[in-house]
Curated annotation (Swiss-Prot):
Catalytic activity, EC: 3.1.-.-
Assembly: Influenza RNA polymerase is composed of three subunits: PB1, PB2 and PA. Interacts (via C-terminus) with PB1 (via N-terminus).
Lineage: Viruses, Riboviria, Orthornavirae, Negarnaviricota, Polyploviricotina
Name of this chain's protein: Polymerase acidic protein
UniProt-listed GO biological process terms: cap snatching; DNA-templated transcription; symbiont-mediated suppression of host gene expression; symbiont-mediated suppression of host mRNA transcription via inhibition of RNA polymerase II activity; viral RNA genome replication; viral translational frameshifting
Enzyme class: hydrolase
Localization, UniProt: Host cytoplasm; Host nucleus
Species in which this protein is naturally found: Influenza A virus (strain A/Pintail/Alberta/119/1979 H4N6)
Annotated Gene Ontology cellular component terms: host cell cytoplasm; host cell nucleus
Molecular function terms from GO: endonuclease activity; metal ion binding; RNA binding
Binding site for Mn(2+) 2: 80, 108
Length: 716
């Protein structure tokens, strides 16, 4: 039978049938009759829809030889053969756009002419018996049923056969041929007898062999077999008294379930200590760009050429001097490193042909800044496993830090609009199916709201820096390569613009494992005076390197230009994630999409357009000490994006732990708000788990303070 199926049906149909069976844990090699039945059903569904179109006037027509220029729409949308999630998405989309009632079971087709879903049946028994089983199962007035048999009979709801005589005859002929082919090979009788009725009751799943033994071994105490455990679980009343249930399950558990009331939760305790400091891999709100508009110089697009061109736009360079030293570092080395960059860039310009990359001379200041020869010597484990007092270093607990106001300002800035666009609208082909049309519309609206957002600039900057650094780490492992920090954007007028934020010099990078570290020194331009918030710049040495003329309302003013220099490090895995920061756009789009879906399901139609275009409506953005902040839909998009971007920029184990543990408390509080009378045990343990993540990370501390604002307002 299996060979017959593979010869008799189109390979695409065979592949879809195999996939469907595997999804339900069935083997096409063993359940061959079922394999044949699924292929037959798929083929009938495809034949049902083949050649049927709707023309420009909305009339149903049959076109057999394809005229590629005709603007035709398929009359039938096929759900059968798609994977379940996709099929349901199509069904939901059709229901939203046409207003048709959503079916309980996944139908096979949708007819755009008659505006109804169709359930196709193919039976080896009497058509009317099978028709009744189908109707009984789906219990829906709205879904049209059409049954075919292998003997040429058919039956349809209200004797409305949907298709013309000829199209149906094609299907019946094909079924008759399949039957004859099977009969000639002696396969028909077994196939005919193997058809079971529509299963409307859940079957008991029999467990045998190893699985049975494992099931018996893994029962909770006091249960002798899987059957009596199953009976116990089936009789479990969900809203009964939990303590009793727990003690019934195991003698060891004695949890007192405490009711969780408005007065129960306390705010999270934020740590004390000096204010937290900036720890991102590059400057955010404090960054300054040297830019060129409409770049058309020779070698445009080669980072080094672009960087030199940007440097030439600034004329206010002066003798650099240290204005905010790094507490622990050898500050003159940072100063010398910057002077060396300037000198070596100058050297490049004096050469005939500018090289594509530039490796710095390995001077003592760079060796120091990049930690050259600082790594402890590695010893083979074989040589030291006999050492009696072998132990890991005692590492000190990190010092706690308190929340500082700068991180909230950073976040606010990330939500703002800039005057440039940082992402282009992707060119994606024409939409064909209704779901694609909705998806494109959402994507375009969302892109319009976030393309100018500063968080989007951070994404593109992060992608660029991480890509360049990973490339250089692999291509020039031993060299101290200079990597310009560049981004590209478009101005309001649509002119292209290339921006230089500063430079990175990378250290030796023999990265074997994902977590092996490459050190780098970053040097970034800024107009921010570090003496205003010295705690923010604890890890930096800041130089004053020039004076910049700025146009203001009162005319030109001269501002000192600073260079923020620090030693930093990253790893292959961190760079890999940094290169994929564009995912943040997707994550925040999906969050917005779930808001649209919620609106749409209430209104029972797609609400995308109204959602984005109703400018008067405000949406909750977040909690602050003042209460629930609200804003336009654009502001919501940008805030969600900024959160996602900061989760990437400030990724850390503290953030992972805080997000996972605080979510549990959040769910309990939400249950209380929804009057679900939640109960908890060991709430103290949960607080401990959350608070052990509040150490010194600025982004985690800010999220914890937001969480406290949420608690205050949620429990009023």
């Amino acid at each position: 039978m299996e060979d017959f199926v593979r010869q008799c049906f189109n390979p695409m149909i065979v592949e879809l049938a195999e996939k469907a069976m595997k999804e339900y844990g069935e083997d096409p090699k063993i359940e061959t009759n079922k394999f044949a039945a699924i292929c037959t059903h798929l083929e009938v569904c495809f034949m049902y829809s083949d050649f049927h179109f709707i023309d420009e006037r909305g009339e149903s027509i049959i076109v057999e030889s394809g005229d590629p220029n005709a603007l035709l729409k398929h009359r039938f949308e096929i759900m059968e053969g798609r994977d379940r999630t996709m099929a349901w998405t199509v069904v939901n989309s059709i229901c939203n756009t046409t207003g048709v009632e959503k079916p309980k079971f996944l139908p096979d087709l949708y007819d755009y002419k008659e505006n109804r879903f169709i359930e196709i049946g193919v039976t080896r028994r009497e058509v009317h018996i099978y028709y009744l089983e189908k109707a009984n199962k789906i219990k829906s007035e709205k879904t049209h049923i059409h049954i075919f048999s292998f003997t040429g009979e058919e039956m349809a709801t209200k004797a409305d056969y949907t298709l013309d005589e000829e199209s149906r005859a094609r299907i019946k002929t094909r079924l008759f041929t399949i039957r004859q082919e099977m009969a000639s090979r002696g396969l028909w009788d077994s196939f005919r007898q193997s058809e079971r009725g529509e299963e409307t009751i859940e079957e008991r799943f029999e467990i045998t062999g190893t699985m049975r033994r494992l099931a018996d071994q893994s029962l909770p105490p006091n249960f002798s077999s899987i059957e009596n455990f199953r009976a116990y679980v089936d009789g479990f009343e969900p809203n009964g008294c939990i303590e009793g249930k727990l003690s019934q399950m195991s003698k060891e558990v004695n949890a007192r379930i405490e009711p969780f009331l408005k007065t129960t939760p306390r705010p999270l305790r934020l740590p004390d200590g000096p204010p937290c400091s900036q720890r991102s891999k590059f400057l955010l709100m404090d960054a300054l760009k040297l830019s060129i508009e409409d770049p058309s110089h020779e070698g445009e697009g080669i980072p080094l050429y672009d960087a030199i061109k940007c440097m030439k736009t600034f004329f206010g360079w002066k003798e650099p001097n240290i204005i905010k030293p790094h507490e622990k570092g050898i500050n003159p080395n940072y100063l010398l490193a910057w002077k060396q960059v300037l000198a070596e860039l100058q050297d490049i310009e004096n050469e005939e042909k500018i090289p594509k990359t530039k490796n710095m001379k390995k001077t003592s200041q760079l060796k120091w800044a990049l930690g050259e020869n600082m790594a402890p010597e590695k010893v083979d484990f074989e040589d030291c496993k006999d050492v009696s007092d072998l132990k890991q270093y005692d590492s000190d607990e990190p010092d706690t830090r308190s929340l500082a106001s700068w991180i909230q300002s950073e976040f606010n800035k990330a939500c703002e609009l800039t005057d440039s666009s940082w992402i282009e609208l992707d060119e994606i082909g024409e939409d064909v199916a209704p779901i694609e049309h909705i998806a494109s519309m959402r994507r375009n609206y969302f892109t319009a709201e976030v393309s100018h957002c500063r968080a989007t600039e951070y994404i593109m900057k992060g992608v660029y820096i991480n890509t360049a650094l990973l490339n250089a780490s692999c291509a020039a492992m031993d060299d101290f390569q200079v990597i310009p920090m560049i981004s590209k954007c478009r101005t309001k007028e649509g002119r292209r613009k290339t921006n230089l934020y500063g430079f990175i010099i990378k250290g030796r990078s023999h990265l074997r494992n994902d977590t092996d570290v490459v050190n780098f020194v970053s040097m970034e331009f800024s107009l921010t005076d570090p003496r205003l918030e010295p705690h923010k710049w604890e890890k930096y040495c800041v130089l004053e390197i020039g004076d910049m003329l700025l146009r203001t309302a009162i005319g030109q003013v001269s501002r000192p230009m600073f260079l923020y220099v620090r030693t930093n490090g990253t790893s292959k895995i961190k760079m890999k994630w940094g290169m994929e920061m564009r995912r943040c756009l997707l994550q925040s789009l999906q969050q917005i999409e779930s808001m649209i879906e919620a609106e749409s399901s209430v209104k029972e139609k797609d609400m995308t357009k109204e959602f984005f275009e109703n400018k008067s409506e405000t949406w909750p953005i977040g909690e602050s000490p003042k209460g629930v902040e609200e804003g336009s839909i654009g502001k919501v998009c940008r805030t969600l994006l900024a959160k996602s971007v900061f989760n990437s920029l400030y990724a850390s184990p503290q953030l992972e732990g805080f997000s996972a543990e605080s979510r549990k408390l959040l769910l309990i509080v939400q249950a209380l708000r929804d009057n679900l009378e939640p109960g908890t045990f060991d709430l103290g343990g949960l607080y401990e788990a959350i608070e052990e993540c509040l150490i010194n990370d600025p982004w985690v501390l800010l999220n914890a303070s937001w969480f406290n604002s949420f608690l205050t307002h949620a429990l009023k």
